[in-house]
Amino acid sequence: MLSSQTSSIFTVSRLNQTVRLLLEQEMGQVWISGEISNFTQPASGHWYFTLKDDTAQVRCAMFRNSNRRVTFRPQHGQQVLVRANITLYEPRGDYQVIAESMQPAGEGLLQQKYEQLKAKLQAEGLFDQQHKQPLPSPAHCVGVITSKTGAALHDILHVLKRRDPSLPVIIYPTAVQGDDAPGQIVRAIELANARGECDVLIVGRGGGSLEDLWSFNDERVARAIFASRIPVVSAVGHETDVTIADFVADLRAPTPSAAAEIVSRNQQELLRQIQSAQQRLGMAMDYYLANRSRRFTQIFHRLQQQHPQLRLARQQTALERLRQRMGFALEARIKQANQRQQRVSQRLSQQNPQPRIHRAQSRIQQLEYRLTENIRSRLSEQRERFGNAVTHLEAVSPLATLARGYTVSTTTDGKVLKKIKQVNAGDIMTTRLEDGWLESEVKSVTPGT
């Protein structure tokens, strides 16, 4: 029997581990409400305490990195709301709660409702910027929805009176705390819209706890503000207090006094602005008049300068100056022309061709004489050389030889006959005599002995 169940036997360690995993996986993170007891804080900075109610208790631990975010010091017997993870301490088998956050029990429940409503309205788009209405500038009438006996109304009226005493203010008194407050606030918003007397509404109250401000976290109030055709400025509590009404309103003011500052004009500042504008206007007028005066003076002077007599006088003066300039220019031109004429005359006198012609003629005559003499000398030399050449030629000329009785015979191809072997019997040859030529036929060839 025992052997059949051995597969289901757990060791203590395995059992505690399995239970721990089951607790962590199945339970996850939960909210626990209970009373604190046995609170301790060792040197490590961690918190150890017990949460209990009338019939049960559980051990809890809150580590230092989590408890440093808690804004209060837990006390023995204090009711708190704890967000925690359920686990088991395996070495001892003790199941315990590991706290992640802690709030006083009353505020914790309200905070949870606050977060749920905020998420719901945000998902519906009530906080979207596209739905925000612009505030009138300036406002002509301000409606105030708050308690008629609260400090908030006093602060609002004080600021409005200081900044803009002439600004009309209509008070819609309501309760701002308690069970009846949300309904009264809704009816006041609806009444202001129905009467249409104001062009901006301030909805708010002074500071307080989360429970004190809870009327402005009511869904009915939020939807009434969203539905208002008149722009709404929320002014609930202090700057650190943020309500659902602040998210839905067209503009959130950190305090009621700040809301009054936002919707009103500062008459003193407005007066200073008017005085400044008047001063700037006066300066602009002075500048404009001075500018116009300067312009008038300029035009007057221009008209005076353009008077016919003045223009005629200026033209006569200009004409006289022009005449003088023309006279000076003419004299200068004449002077320049005379100077140029003198320079040209000097250059012409320096470049007169007559002396050069005389010098050229003398040079030509000299060259002609020298050329004639040279030709004569050359001709004499040539005659002498020619005579010598003739004498020499006559001495060696064949004609002279022919005159002495000799002859010269040549073959038909023009070769001079020097030997008998150059011809044969029957050949034709030509013989040159002193006074002519003979053509003869060789009858026979006889060698000399």
Curated annotation (Swiss-Prot):
It catalyses: Exonucleolytic cleavage in either 5'- to 3'- or 3'- to 5'-direction to yield nucleoside 5'-phosphates. It comes from the Bacteria. It is found in: Cytoplasm. It is an enzyme of class 3 (hydrolase). Keywords: Cytoplasm, Exonuclease, Hydrolase, Nuclease. One of its GO terms (cellular component) is exodeoxyribonuclease VII complex. It holds the Pfam family Exonuc_VII_L. Its main location: cytoplasm. GO terms for biological process: DNA catabolic process. GO terms for molecular function: exodeoxyribonuclease VII activity; nucleic acid binding. Its EC number is 3.1.11.6. HAMAP family: Exonuc_7_L. Bidirectionally degrades single-stranded DNA into large acid-insoluble oligonucleotides, which are then degraded further into small acid-soluble oligonucleotides. Heterooligomer composed of large and small subunits. Belongs to the XseA family. This is Exodeoxyribonuclease 7 large subunit. It comes from Salmonella paratyphi A (strain AKU_12601).
